[in-house]
A protein has these predicted regions:
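Short, surface-exposed alpha-helix to beta-strand junction/turn motifs within ectodomains of secreted
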Residues: 396-441, 466-473, 482-487
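Extracellular interdomain linker/stem segments of modular secreted and single-pass surface proteins
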Residues: 378-381, 489-493
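Exposed aromatic-hydrophobic patches
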Residues: 452-456
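Blade-terminus and WD-like Trp-Asp/Gly-His loop motifs, strongest in beta-propeller folds
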Residues: 389, 443-447
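Hydrophobic h-region of N-terminal signal peptides that target proteins for export
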Residues: 5-19
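Structural beta-strand segments of beta-rich domains
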Residues: 393-397, 451
């Protein structure tokens, strides 16, 4: 008994140590709440709800795929005063981390397959399960499979995590596939470590999110390009398998402790990360993302990406642009204080952002085990950075409201820092090769909603941190968030 007590105590101390390693919050929850309220939906606690995926249905209901293998239908989740009624459509699945809906059928991505599920007799329960694809192997709990919403052509994209950070133990781990409606499995990319979601970006191009780890210095949003290599070479045995051969020859081995920008110049298939999320400052395990297509019902950020984070229980924003054939962009703080580790988000037509997840497996900031929440715009527009875009001599920064002209034109209100990471086989990376670019000119637009910053010292391949200092709106309001982070893969010509 004494040895058992010692073991349990050691486990508790280890868990506490892990929990202490969670990053700090931004400290902006009170300011954020004026603009976006968090509403907890009253779901029966006996459900032990662990959300893994969402899809908003044509009839106004919400479907939830759960980690416990259910597909639940929620009626009333999108009502102004939510009184949700939950029914079980399907059960007995395994970690439903992707859910789509098309022509009366669900497309569920679970650990071992993509399944098309339908209700033929109309009783509200699934009675037909069609295996669309199970070409990949499965040997370990870490081998998560994430699925996209159903695409306009009926396809589902699946990204497959490795057996662990350093191991490839089953077929096609670390690969991505396009699963067609007739069940074909088309290889798309390789080099994935541990994804957290896959979906189109705001421009309709397929992306996925990756967690920090070996060959990934920080969490990031990556372009899921056909034939692309996402960075982790442990998956290379998959190129010797029949479907892997369709991607062509395996890429060159990356050089350990190099830089991603340099290696992507040497290895044709290797793609730079489109948006780097600085570790702990902008999440620790980013997950689901969706573009805001609500047409302004969710505030001023329409057509931008909203990105959840499991560890810190936060939602962030991201914007992307293509420069010289390479995707890049920025990430921005948005809303902290969610109830648990976010694995799934979804917009409703009414302008709500539904969030849900779990706290099982790894430490999370949120303190609620089973919760379904939604973010609602209060109608009060926050004064915040709207978007940062790269320019040939600096950046163009826009805001959600007109700025005070004096503060907008003052170059001392803009501080920049650039850095990159080791591209290495070890876990994560410190921020390295730091520089301090200088804003030499700030040219406001005539309406006060944007400014062109001329910057001396831009560094291609670096993340550029922004601190916006004493900027004020035309009404004297400070920014809700004073930081943003742009990944500058290419300087526009």
């Amino acid at each position: 008994m004494r040895s058992l007590h010692i073991a349990l105590t050691a486990a508790a101390l280890a868990a506490a140590a892990d929990a202490q390693e969670l990053g700090d919050t931004w400290g902006t929850a009170n300011a954020e709440s004026r603009h976006y309220r968090i509403v907890e939906l009253p779901i029966p606690r006996e459900l032990s709800l662990e959300c893994g995926s969402f899809v908003a249905l044509p009839d106004g209901k919400l479907a939830i795929g759960t980690r416990r293998g259910e597909i639940l239908i929620v009626d009333g989740a999108f009502e102004p005063l939510p009184r949700p009624v939950v029914t079980t459509f399907a059960a007995g699945l395994d970690e439903v981390l992707g859910l789509g809906y098309r022509d009366g059928a669900f497309y569920a991505t679970q650990q071992t397959e993509v399944t098309r599920i339908s209700d033929r007799d109309g009783d509200g329960r699934a009675d037909r399960f069609e295996n669309l694809s199970d070409v990949w192997g499965f040997e370990h709990y870490h081998e998560f499979a994430w699925g996209s919403p159903v695409q306009p052509d009926g396809s589902v994209y699946v990204v497959l995590g490795l057996s662990s950070s350093y191991h490839y133990k089953a077929d096609y781990r670390g690969f991505a596939f396009q699963i067609t409606p007739d069940g074909q499995s088309v290889p798309v990319a390789s080099g994935i470590r541990s994804a957290g979601g896959v979906a189109p970006n705001e421009h309709g191009v397929m992306f996925y999110v990756e967690s920090q780890g070996p060959w990934n210095g920080s969490c990031s949003l990556k372009h899921l390009k056909q034939g692309g290599f996402m960075g982790h070479p442990i998956c290379f045995p998959g190129y010797d398998l029949p479907l892997g051969k369709q991607l062509g020859p395996k890429p060159l081995e990356p050089e350990n402790q190099s830089r991603l920008h340099a290696e992507s110049e040497r290895i044709d298939a290797l793609l730079p990360y489109a948006v780097v999320f600085p570790y702990r400052r902008m999440g620790q395990s980013i997950t689901a993302f969706r573009p805001d297509r609500t047409g302004g019902k969710f505030g001023p950020f329409q057509n931008q990406l909203f990105v959840g984070d499991y560890s810190l229980s936060i939602v962030m924003r991201a914007t992307t642009e293509e420069v010289d054939g390479v995707w890049q962009g920025a990430c921005y703080p948005f809303r902290e204080g969610l109830g648990n580790g976010i694995l799934a988000i979804e917009f409703s037509d009414r302008g709500y952002l539904i969030t849900g997840g779990t706290n099982r497996g790894w430490p999370v900031r949120g303190n609620k085990s089973f919760v379904l929440e939604r973010l609602e715009w209060t109608g009060v527009t926050p004064f915040d950075v709207l978007e940062i875009r790269a320019a040939k001599d600096g950046f163009d920064v826009s805001f959600t409201a007109p700025c005070d002209p004096a503060t907008l034109a003052d170059v001392t209100n803009y501080r920049l820092r650039s850095f990159t990471h080791h591209y290495q086989k070890f876990y994560g990376s410190p921020e390295v090769d730091e520089t301090t670019p200088v804003v030499t000119e700030a040219a406001p637009s005539s309406d006060g909603r944007s400014v062109h910053l001329v910057v001396d010292g831009l560094v291609e391949g670096h993340v550029h941190d922004f601190i916006f200092g004493a900027l004020r709106s035309a009404d004297g309001e400070p920014l809700v968030h004073t930081t943003a982070h742009y990944t500058l893969n290419r300087i526009p010509k």
